[in-house]
């Protein structure tokens, strides 16, 4: 958490400094007063250490050894020779030293170890060792002798004060640290109620709206939101009110979090960032407490922005999913609803949230007054992809054969994250080959790696298996070329990539937002082309078509159940029984049609798949010679691009192979 002062507009329009948010746990450091530097914790520790040393000194001075006056060894021999000693108690230690404590038959003037004299009948003397000869000498002189096992001063000290030392250590090093007194955001029972939001200053984030592309409408909406905070008078003059919240919706990788970073870089106000998962813990009430603490910090630093990433972790619809609602999550959501638009209003505090699961969010969270604006961020179109690629390649050296426009055309369906990964993979490939510039070949190899997976050339495949794979992929290629409405082929390979032994890659010429019946049937037909080719050539089929069959069945079932493309069943939605319950708002999926209708659905799905399979058989039977030639060349070269495929197969009813390169 930074304590850098961030400037924000004052009432007079000047730029003043706002107070940095106090770190978690209150006063940072041990014995630190308000305003003291972080180094203030060290004097507290030294004070504790000095107190311990003082206790040790007092013990050694007043409680160690014996309370009798200590005399010199020569004085001890003198009183012993004069037969003044009546009894002696010997305490022996592990280092063989001993302390002799004795009594005299009458008070005598004795010389102490500090060279002074004292009239006393008691004494003590330290000797390096106590032997049997010394014991016999004392016994012969009629001295009563008693021998005890003594303990060292340190052991005695620890025995007396160890419990207190341990307690003090626990207090300073455990409890105070766990309560956050050292300034750290400790994740423990004493700081559970504290918000874990990180405050970001304008000096920390370098990302701005100039670093974001392909989402022009979203940028426009968010720029207006930022302007609400920096120049509210412009909107207040005509009665406009600042929006309470902005919800960013869209699939993963489209730039929702990047937009939040850009807001932090553009807004000259405090910016609090937190994940939705950081609210809920194992203890009840923690989530609601953290929401309260977050908004309290935000109010102290208003105007400001709060960003909650993956808000579906805490904003899920109440009472949804298996087992009913989660009480702790519901309490957290209720507190969030109150803070956003409850009895008390939060002026000049805007909440921005991001999610890729808007379908599971609670309806109370989505209403106007809380999230006033819902901005959808979808995958970019060709112009958006071109703008994104220009941003990601502005610091990379490109060869003259790289055309960004062509590269954008050859990457339909790519999200912003996919495009960033594409540029990075191309740069890594160029660096691997000691290149100075990134070429079009590098981009093509990187795109193939993303679409088809990395090559596994080290994997050993027998000639028989390679031949089977070649005919399977050749079947896909020929059926696709001779089926109307199909996607153009980009590349075919029998080099193992990812988890597959071979692959046929398709690359549409344009972005598709809707699919007609002809296109869907073409997808099913060329998906089954590999299975049909195996049956025609080898008179048997293999497990290699398992994924193709799964995809074909899924498309056919959706055509009948969801998209109303069955002539006998009509345009009726029969639901999707394959969707997991916990991903939606329903407790369970109820089949809303009869057994007879279910049977009709199965029959329609089977008819669609079998019809497409017959079409694939017809194509391959007519093109059997081309199939053998294509498979043979594929076995020899292992990979064929679009131009090579077109030279072998010639034109067909479907789309021509797509020869586009970067």
Swiss-Prot record:
Q: Is Cell membrane one of the keywords UniProt gives this record?
A: yes
Q: What cofactors does the UniProt entry give for this protein? A: Zn(2+)
Identify the residue ranges that face the Cytoplasmic compartment according to the record: 1-39, 176-662
Protein EC: 3.4.24.-
- Keyword Zinc in the entry? The reply is yes
What does the entry list as the binding residues for ATP?
250-257
Its localization reads: Cell inner membrane
Question: Where is the sequence biased in composition, kind Basic and acidic residues?
Answer: 1-15
Q: Which GO terms describe its biological process?
A: protein catabolic process; proteolysis
Residues annotated as the enzyme's active site: 473
Q: Which residues lie on this side of the membrane: Periplasmic?
A: 61-154
Per the entry, the cofactor note is:
Binds 1 zinc ion per subunit.
Which residues are listed for Zn(2+) binding in this entry? 472, 476, 548
Q: Give the protein family.
A: In the central section; belongs to the AAA ATPase family.
Function according to Swiss-Prot or TrEMBL: Acts as a processive, ATP-dependent zinc metallopeptidase for both cytoplasmic and membrane proteins. Plays a role in the quality control of integral membrane proteins.
Q: Kindly state the subunit structure of this protein.
A: Homohexamer.
Q: What is this protein called?
A: ATP-dependent zinc metalloprotease FtsH
Q: Which organism is it from?
A: Pelodictyon phaeoclathratiforme (strain DSM 5477 / BU-1)
